[in-house]
Amino acid sequence: MRTTFMAKANEVERKWYVVDAEGQTLGRLSTEVASILRGKNKPTFTPHVDTGDHVIIINAEKIHLTGNKLNDKIYYRHTNHPGGLKQRTALEMRTNYPVQMLELAIKGMLPKGRLGRQVSKKLNVYAGAEHPHQAQKPEVYELRG
């Protein structure tokens, strides 16, 4: 009888990928990046172990949203003070906080809890085309579709 392979946390080999967000749709990019961060693209995927790779996203300020979402989509946050509910449109987020916009989309697709926090540490998002991770020799990742 064969047993299912379970990866060990210290035996996982991690790669570094660079993803260019220029002209990419926010949701489609986010789902694929979340899948890479979890390690679901590997045959050694184990649900309770962090088997994913590191992802660097560049050009976050040039992300694309379909339809009228730039004006209609609203991001809410609360200051934890009475009456402290703040809101921003997607257009404001893309112009002023493009890194936070992408991080929110991707982290929402990761598991909640200890494993999700550990996985999200492997995400690096940059608004421009430059990143400080050249020493890791990241591979360019071509998105499907």
From Swiss-Prot:
Pfam families: Ribosomal_L13. This is Large ribosomal subunit protein uL13. NCBIfam families: rplM_bact. Coiled coil: none annotated. Signal peptide: none annotated. It comes from Bacillus cereus (strain G9842). PROSITE patterns: RIBOSOMAL_L13. The keyword ATP-binding does not apply. InterPro entries: Ribosomal_uL13, Ribosomal_uL13_bac-type, Ribosomal_uL13_CS, Ribosomal_uL13_sf. This protein is one of the early assembly proteins of the 50S ribosomal subunit, although it is not seen to bind rRNA by itself. It is important during the early stages of 50S assembly. The gene is rplM. Part of the 50S ribosomal subunit. Belongs to the universal ribosomal protein uL13 family.
